[in-house]
Each structure stands twice: as C-alpha cells, then as structure tokens.
C-alpha cells in the first residue's frame, strides 16, 4: 500500500479530467508517484553531495527532476 494519502491523488486524477476513479487507480498512481519521488530524491542527494553539501535544496530537486 502506498504511503501517500489517497484523496489528494484522486484530486490529481480528477484535475486531469477523469469523472470517476477506481480505488485501484488511485493506489496505482500513488505508488508510481512514490517511486518517482524516491528516484528524484536519490538523484538530488547525489547532486547535493557533489556540491559539497549535506542539505538537499529545492534547486537539487528541480535539477534531478529535469534529468529524469
């Protein structure tokens, strides 16, 4: 089961134009978002370390997201 709250995930799908959404669809998107978020986070940590920092900054996240 995904750790992200399901209600906001459902709103994301609704904002994309869906009228009805199954619980399985919400769970699947939540899982995909978590996996993508972890991948971006790992890359952002690498970028911060490469810059000689222990703190991950917003720019690290933005750069990591663009690279993936």
From Swiss-Prot:
Pfam families the record matches: CBFD_NFYB_HMF
Cellular component GO terms held in the UniProt record: chromosome; cytoplasm
CDD domains assigned: HFD_archaea_histone-like (cd22909)
Transmembrane segments: none
Gene3D superfamilies given in the database record: Histone, subunit A
Assigned protein family: Belongs to the archaeal histone HMF family.
Subunit structure of this chain's protein: Homodimer or heterodimer with HmtB. Dimers then assemble into higher oligomers, with the DNA wrapped around the protein core.
Protein function: Binds and compacts DNA (95 to 150 base pairs) to form nucleosome-like structures that contain positive DNA supercoils.
Protein name per the record: DNA-binding protein HMt-1.1
Species: Methanothermobacter thermautotrophicus (strain ATCC 29096 / DSM 1053 / JCM 10044 / NBRC 100330 / Delta H)
């Amino acid at each position: 089961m995904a750790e992200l709250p399901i209600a906001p995930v459902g709103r994301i799908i609704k904002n994309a134009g869906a009228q009805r959404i199954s619980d399985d669809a919400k769970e699947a998107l939540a899982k995909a978002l978590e996996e993508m978020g972890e991948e971006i986070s790992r890359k952002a940590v690498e970028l911060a370390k490469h810059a000689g920092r222990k703190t991950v900054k917003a720019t690290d996240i933005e750069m990591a997201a663009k690279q993936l």
